[in-house]
């Protein structure tokens, strides 16, 4: 762990508070990790020990952080033996957590119309960011989510109007609806009320509906698979709006020591290699996906 991050990343023996399973081997895990909960910001993640038999931790994005209750929520999909073992945890079990790690999203006040785009396991940071933005009256978040497997929540028709949303696209995330945050869903799987296509195409459709003068108020934030992030960056370029993307990358140490997660990033001084774990995971889309 580098000296810069030593005082902001905590190791905690977190107690499992709840563990809910959804379709397609997706889980929402709530952990008692008060230090992490107090310091987490949207876009940061935790490095978990899935089981004592495995030496390597797994990075998981934080979906919610409740400082008052000292808890964090993470959403994950079982891929590989490590997360399969994590899925066996029940309330009362303990999980070693290292976090929060990483630089998160930084909304800019001059662009209060925030477009949040999440795909698959890239959904959690968007929920976290939406929760923080709704606490401030000046921000106007719109959350768009895409998935090709059943969503990790029970979608329902929205009662919040989203001007510019394609006709019939009414499915939403209930939690966001309860917060008063508008959301819409996209999928190629033909789920009721969802936009039939990629979530980035839904984002483009909504941006197209805006008066060109309104684009100066919009900033995009995205998290998901690399192919989705490239598409989000292209949409942002097309409409001339800034976009921050949260990258997904394989990690070993996750605290900047091994540089195993380094990616090429364009900087004013030229190309550079940046560590996704501590230099990111959030970067300007133009730096990661230049024209």
Locate the predicted segments by residue.
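FNR/FR-type flavoprotein reductase catalytic core
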Residues: 84-245
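Local cysteine-cluster metal-coordination motifs and their immediate loop/turn environment
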Residues: 125, 226-228, 248-282
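Active-site/ligand-binding loops adjacent to catalytic centers
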Residues: 162, 276, 291
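A charged, well-structured terminal subsegment
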Residues: 280-291
């Amino acid at each position: 762990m580098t000296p810069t991050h030593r005082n902001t990343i905590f190791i905690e023996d977190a107690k499992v508070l709840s563990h809910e399973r959804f379709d397609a081997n997706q889980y929402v895990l709530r952990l008692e990790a008060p230090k992490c909960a107090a310091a987490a910001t949207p876009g940061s993640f935790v490095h978990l020990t899935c089981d004592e038999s495995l030496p390597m931790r797994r990075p998981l994005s934080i979906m919610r952080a409740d400082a008052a209750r000292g808890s964090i929520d993470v959403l994950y999909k079982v891929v590989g033996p490590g997360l399969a073992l994590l899925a066996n945890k029940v309330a009362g079990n303990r999980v070693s957590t290292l976090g929060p790690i990483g630089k998160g999203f930084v909304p800019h006040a001059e662009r209060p119309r925030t477009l949040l785009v999440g795909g698959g396991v890239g959904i959690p940071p968007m929920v976290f960011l939406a929760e923080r933005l709704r606490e401030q009256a000046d921000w106007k978040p719109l959350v768009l989510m895409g998935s090709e497997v059943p969503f990790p929540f029970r979608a329902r028709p929205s009662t919040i109007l989203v001007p510019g949303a394609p006709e019939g696209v009414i499915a939403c995330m209930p939690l966001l609806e309860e917060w008063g945050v508008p959301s819409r869903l996209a999928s190629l799987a033909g789920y009721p009320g969802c936009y039939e296509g990629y979530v980035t195409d839904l984002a483009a459709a909504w941006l197209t509906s805006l008066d060109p003068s309104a684009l100066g108020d919009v900033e995009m934030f995205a998290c998901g698979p690399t192919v989705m992030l490239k598409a989000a960056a292209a949409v942002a370029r097309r409409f001339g709006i800034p976009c921050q993307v949260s990258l997904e990358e394989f990690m070993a140490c996750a605290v900047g020591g091994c540089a195993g997660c380094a990616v090429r990033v364009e900087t004013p001084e030229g190309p550079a290699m940046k560590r996704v774990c501590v230099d990111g995971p959030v970067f300007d889309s133009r730096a990661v996906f230049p024209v």
